[in-house]
């Protein structure tokens, strides 16, 4: 008997121009366009296996081995239903295709990083879900069209259907058909963009993004200014910076937009605080590092950005990443040795230090554990279809 199964992985993306606020909460249509960098799946990814079988009684999903309820009308159910509908269209056109759109599916998904740690697990998770179902159903659908479906699971998931540098175009139509992701440039266009993720807190956050952003839409006058007057110009400017590989402009816009996102969180009633003292100290370090860089070269060398949580992501060209790691480790000593995937430091490991001319008084040193971990990664590719040896379901259709 045929086994209808496919496995795919999808990447994490970290926004430079932030998505914050929905104009339609059911369809997940944003109040503004956004732009992100896709990170390397060799370091951060969600992997998902989907199987369709006539013996399955209902659609079921397991995340990191624990079953998650698929609520009727919920985001998971919506994505699965939309993907089944695309498969049914194929079957209706070609009588020779097996009618697997009518079968229930079992889906098993794993992240190789902590879920809800402020690393965008919902984005990579829903992108991997859509990618695995697209492979299972052998859909000829374009990535942009698939991104419309991923968007209905988690807004930022639509951006994880591409590698490199990705825009989520907010669209204008009320049905959301023009709210989708497009690639601004592939990974190969600017491969030397590296990222250092500073994991400040790997617990669940206090205010979820979904609840927080709608409170901002309802109460923040600053958000309305941002949507109308700030984001459109920044989207154009950062897209141009990416196309011309202008890191100075890319960094400046990325930091400005992170700052404004946290300003609209603060402008919300009651205010929302995602950053903590450690987050703010990392900003102070990068600002001072850049001050020295501008003095010497006239250009910025690093960009911080923060999503809805305290974790910092620092973008920098490959040639400067070593200095950035040394700087962070000097102020935030690590309990465990730095995992050095690119072999920057050799057997001796990383020693904390600052660059010449750096004013060390910009922040106090913190104790071990203030930054719980450092993840060094780089710009990466889009979803990958994996072989059966990487499947997460056993022959009985339950998680391995």
Curated annotation (Swiss-Prot):
The keyword ATP-binding applies. One of its GO terms (molecular function) is ATP binding. Gene3D superfamilies: 3.30.230.10, GHMP kinase, C-terminal domain. (R)-5-diphosphomevalonate binds at residues 19-22, 75, 154-159, 210. Residues 381-400 are annotated as: Disordered. GO terms for biological process: isopentenyl diphosphate biosynthetic process, mevalonate pathway; sterol biosynthetic process. Coiled coil: none annotated. Pathway: Isoprenoid biosynthesis; isopentenyl diphosphate biosynthesis via mevalonate pathway; isopentenyl diphosphate from (R)-mevalonate: step 3/3. It catalyses: (R)-5-diphosphomevalonate + ATP = isopentenyl diphosphate + ADP + phosphate + CO2. Its EC number is 4.1.1.33. It comes from the Eukaryota. It is an enzyme of class 4 (lyase). Induction: By methyl jasmonate (MeJA). One of its GO terms (cellular component) is cytosol. Keywords: ATP-binding, Lipid biosynthesis, Lipid metabolism, Lyase, Nucleotide-binding, Steroid biosynthesis, Steroid metabolism, Sterol biosynthesis, Sterol metabolism. Belongs to the diphosphomevalonate decarboxylase family. Diphosphomevalonate decarboxylase; part of the second module of ergosterol biosynthesis pathway that includes the middle steps of the pathway. The second module involves the formation of farnesyl diphosphate, which is also an important intermediate in the biosynthesis of ubiquinone, dolichol, heme and prenylated proteins. This module also plays a key role in the biosynthesis of triterpenes such as ganoderic acids (GA), a group of highly oxygenated lanostane-type triterpenoids which are well recognized as a main group of unique bioactive compounds in the medicinal mushroom Ganoderma lucidum. This is Diphosphomevalonate decarboxylase. The gene is MVD.
């Amino acid at each position: 008997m045929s086994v209808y199964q496919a496995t795919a992985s999808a990447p994490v993306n970290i926004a430079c121009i932030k998505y914050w606020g929905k104009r339609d909460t059911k369809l997940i249509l944003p109040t503004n366009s956004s732009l992100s960098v896709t990170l390397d799946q060799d370091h951060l990814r969600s992997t998902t296996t989907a199987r369709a079988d006539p013996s399955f009684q209902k659609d079921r999903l397991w995340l990191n081995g624990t079953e998650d309820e698929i609520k009727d009308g919920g985001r998971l159910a919506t994505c699965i239903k939309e993907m089944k509908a695309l498969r049914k269209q194929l079957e209706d056109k070609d009588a020779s295709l097996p009618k697997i759109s009518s079968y229930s599916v079992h889906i098993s998904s794993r992240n190789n990083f902590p879920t809800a740690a402020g690393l965008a697990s919902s984005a990579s998770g829903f992108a991997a879900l859509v990618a695995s179902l697209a492979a299972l159903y052998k859909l000829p659908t374009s990535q942009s069209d698939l991104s419309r479906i991923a968007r209905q699971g988690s807004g930022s998931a639509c951006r994880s259907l591409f590698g490199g540098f990705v825009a989520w175009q907010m669209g204008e139509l009320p049905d959301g058909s023009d709210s989708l992701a497009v690639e601004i440039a592939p990974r190969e266009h600017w491969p030397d963009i590296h990222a250092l993720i500073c994991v400040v807190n790997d617990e669940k956050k206090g205010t979820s993004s979904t609840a927080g952003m709608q409170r901002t839409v309802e109460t923040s006058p600053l958000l309305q200014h941002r949507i109308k007057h700030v984001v459109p110009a920044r989207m154009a400017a950062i897209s141009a910076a990416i196309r011309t590989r202008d890191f100075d402009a890319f960094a400046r816009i990325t930091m400005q937009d992170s700052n404004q996102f946290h300003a609209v969180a603060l402008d919300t009633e009651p205010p929302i605080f995602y950053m903590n003292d450690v987050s703010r100290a990392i900003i102070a370090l990068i600002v001072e590092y850049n001050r020295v860089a501008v003095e010497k070269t006239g250009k910025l060398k690093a960009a911080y950005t923060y999503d809805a949580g305290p974790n910092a992501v620092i973008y920098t060209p490959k040639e400067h990443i070593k200095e950035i790691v040394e700087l962070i480790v000097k102020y935030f000593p690590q309990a465990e040795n730095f995992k050095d995937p690119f072999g920057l430091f050799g057997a001796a490991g990383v020693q904390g230090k600052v660059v010449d001319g750096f004013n060390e008084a910009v922040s106090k040193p913190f104790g071990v554990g203030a930054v719980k971990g450092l993840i060094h990664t780089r710009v990466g590719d889009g979803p990958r279809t994996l072989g059966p040896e990487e499947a997460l379901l056993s022959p009985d259709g339950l998680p391995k």
